[in-house]
Each structure stands twice: as structure tokens, then as C-alpha cells.
Regions:
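N-terminal signal-anchor module of multipass membrane proteins
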Residues: 1-63, 347-350
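Structural signature of hydrophobic alpha-helical transmembrane segments
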Residues: 41-53, 92-101, 209-223, 266-278
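A generic, well-ordered mixed alpha/beta core segment in the N-terminal half of proteins
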Residues: 81-154
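C-terminal ends of transmembrane helices
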Residues: 8, 56-68, 106-117, 227-238, ...
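Cytoplasmic-side transmembrane-helix entry/capping segments in multi-pass membrane proteins
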Residues: 69-80, 98-101, 118-129, 241-249, ...
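Long hydrophobic alpha-helical segments that form multi-pass transmembrane helix bundles
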Residues: 123-224
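Cytosolic-side transmembrane-helix boundaries in multi-pass membrane proteins
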Residues: 1-20, 313-352
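Loop-to-transmembrane alpha-helix initiation sites
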Residues: 120-125, 269-278, 299, 317-330
Length: 352
């Protein structure tokens, strides 16, 4: 019998790629539960659509490339992309929005560059930006939390809104949104940005019913849910601490400085940290091992730059939330960051 020796390392952690991906997906569950509680079961419908779509597109591309289908599907990377995209779009977005996003994420961003490990950008965020730029109306159709709705939308009506654009009584998403005390803005970040532009102070804006004491009603708990999941990933050593800590620290520092400089028009540190996609961005998106920086020093720089861009775009840009744009922009800089932060090889110090 011929024996062969595999290449090193021979001692490993027994953490397969599939197990890592499924662990990250499981860590999304607290944030997912918070979204379902505060924004309805539409997010579950989007999640099912996304998982089916990414599986179909991944399998189709593997067949076209004459590669084995099951190994590509079973590694879980496509499923994680679908989960992150489904959690990022409005729960009642039309069904074709998530399908187009999954098509772009898997076929263009991931497989066109060679598949897992070769994509330059985070597939879920690249797809999110494509959808936001191409379909801004559908991608900003966030409903207020269910407690503020005059008539809570049941599962069947949410299903009808996603697939037909209307409830059983003939109401569209826009009509449902406009029925909540005249509120038509999508998220707390939207509301503060618009109100400040119209001359209101932050404290006046936050008197509206969509806000809680610290941040947007519902969004605070969604972010805390993703924070809990992110802390679990850190404890399980699935991700390193450098990127989320530098991301959150940079955003906290910038927002604190902004609040000190202009307390009337800047919402402050806690609001920035617990609104929008801050926590899912810090722990689940920016930490993508393929498109993020690879050295510890580089990860600190990478995360800090993303946090800085999130603050700048939220404050001075045209989009209220900026995590996706910030991650993609710093993805471009990753080769440069890695080049200048490579650790010095022992025995090859600089010549004096």
C-alpha cells in the first residue's frame, strides 16, 4: 500500500470552512430576531428568497465552469452572502430586488473573479450598493417599527407586498408608511439628516415617535443583537478583534468630536453606534477574510478608515448610512495597506 504525506501543517484546529461559515450565520440570529420583532416577518421571506437564489446561482456557475457543485455550495460562503444581503435590505422590498442582488453578488462579484478567495470586494455589500443606486425607492422603503403602525401587517400581507406590491386591502408600502403620523422617512438616520437640513436641532428631531432614548426605536435592539453575535464570534476566535474594535473606536471618536463641536446638529456617539448598520458592519461585513486586510497592523488601519468614512458620509454625504460604501472604498485600498504593513522577516532587518 502506497502512503502519501499531505503538506504541512499537520496539526490543525478542525474548524472546516463550512463550520466557520455556519457559525457566522448562527451569530446573526440575535440581530435577525430583533429585526423580526420590530420590523415584521418580511425579513424571513427575504432570507428564504436569498438562500434559494444564491444556491441556484452558485450551482449554475459551477456547472458552467464544469466544477463540482456540492463542494462549492456546502462551504457555506454563498449562504452567508445571501444572509447578509437579506438582513441589509428593507423587509418589504419587492422579490426581484433580492434576486438581482444575489445574482450580482454571486455571479459578478464572487465567481467572475475566480470564486471564493479571489473576490476583491465584499459580495453582499457590492450587491447592496448596486441595488441602492439602481433602485433607490425600493431600497429605502423601510417601515417604522410595528408598534407605530396603525394596523400591524400580518404575514400574509407582508408576503403579498413582497410579491404583488399590495396588501389584501390594496395598500402599497408607501401608503402604509405614510399612515404613521405622516412619517415617510425610512430610518432614524434618514430622519435626523433631513430634519437638521431643514433647520431643526437633533434634540427636536429625536422627539418624534420613531426614536427611543438613545437611538432609533427598534434599531437600538437590532444593533445590540448583532453586537451580541459579534462578541460570540470574538470569543469563538472566528474573527480577530482588530477590525471591529478599530471600526467602532474610530466611529465613536469622530462622532464624539463632532458632537462636542456642534451639539445642536450632531446626534452624538451612542446614536451613531446603535443606528443603521454599524454593528453588523463592524463584526460581520468588514471582517470578511477575503477582502479585508491580512496583517494585524493593517486590520487596525483598515477598520479605522472604515469608521472614519462611515462618519464622514453620514454627516456630509448624500446617503444617511454609509457602511456599504465605506467597506467597498477601503477594500480598494487593502493591497496598499497590506503592502506597507507586512511584518519584517526575522533576519532581514533594515541595513544600518
Amino acid at each position: 500500500m502506497k502512503l502519501t504525506m499531505a503538506s504541512s501543517p499537520h496539526n490543525h484546529s478542525h474548524k472546516s470552512l463550512t463550520r466557520l461559515m455556519l457559525t457566522v450565520i448562527a451569530a446573526c440570529i440575535p440581530g435577525l430576531i430583533a429585526q423580526v420583532v420590530f420590523f415584521g416577518t418580511g425579513v424571513l421571506i427575504q432570507l428564504v428568497l436569498a438562500l434559494v437564489a444564491v444556491s441556484v446561482f452558485e450551482a449554475a456557475i459551477m456547472l458552467m465552469r464544469k466544477r463540482p457543485v456540492w463542494p462549492a455550495l456546502s462551504d457555506g460562503s454563498a449562504w452567508l452572502t445571501g444572509v447578509l444581503l437579506a438582513l441589509s435590505i428593507p423587509p418589504l422590498a419587492p422579490w426581484w430586488v433580492i434576486i438581482i442582488g444575489c445574482l450580482f453578488a454571486i455571479v459578478i462579484v464572487k465567481q467572475l473573479y475566480g470564486g471564493l478567495g479571489f473576490n476583491l470586494f465584499n459580495p453582499a455589500m457590492a450587491a447592496y450598493v448596486l441595488l441602492l443606486v439602481s433602485f433607490p425607492v425600493q431600497m429605502t422603503a423601510w417601515l417604522p417599527v410595528t408598534d407605530l403602525l396603525n394596523a400591524p401587517i400580518g404575514f400574509i400581507d407582508q408576503l403579498r407586498l413582497i410579491f404583488t406590491d399590495f396588501t389584501a386591502l390594496g395598500f402599497s408600502v408607501d401608503q402604509v408608511r405614510a399612515g404613521v403620523d405622516g412619517l415617510t422617512m425610512a430610518t432614524p438616520l434618514d430622519t435626523v439628516k433631513t430634519d437638521v437640513a431643514h433647520g431643526l436641532t437633533v434634540s427636536e428631531s429625536m422627539q418624534k415617535p420613531i426614536f427611543s432614548q438613545w437611538a432609533g426605536l427598534g434599531w437600538l435592539w437590532v444593533n445590540l443583537g448583532f453586537l451580541a453575535g459579534g462578541l460570540y464570534l470574538l470569543k469563538a476566535k472566528i474573527i480577530n478583534w482588530h477590525i471591529p474594535v478599530s471600526f467602532i473606536g474610530s466611529l465613536a471618536l469622530c462622532s464624539a468630536i463632532g458632537y462636542i463641536a456642534a451639539p445642536g446638529t450632531e446626534p452624538g456617539m451612542v446614536f451613531h453606534l446603535l443606528s443603521g448598520a454599524t454593528m453588523i458592519g463592524a463584526f460581520f461585513i468588514a471582517t470578511d477574510p477575503v477582502s479585508a486586510a491580512t496583517t494585524n497592523k493593517g486590520r487596525l488601519i483598515y477598520g479605522a478608515l472604515i469608521g472614519l468614512l462611515v462618519y464622514l458620509i453620514r454627516t456630509f454625504g448624500g446617503f444617511p448610512d454609509a457602511v456599504a460604501f465605506s467597506v467597498l472604498l477601503i477594500n480598494i485600498a487593502v493591497p496598499l495597506i497590506d503592502y506597507y504593513t507586512q511584518p519584517r522577516t526575522y533576519g532581514h532587518g533594515a541595513v544600518k
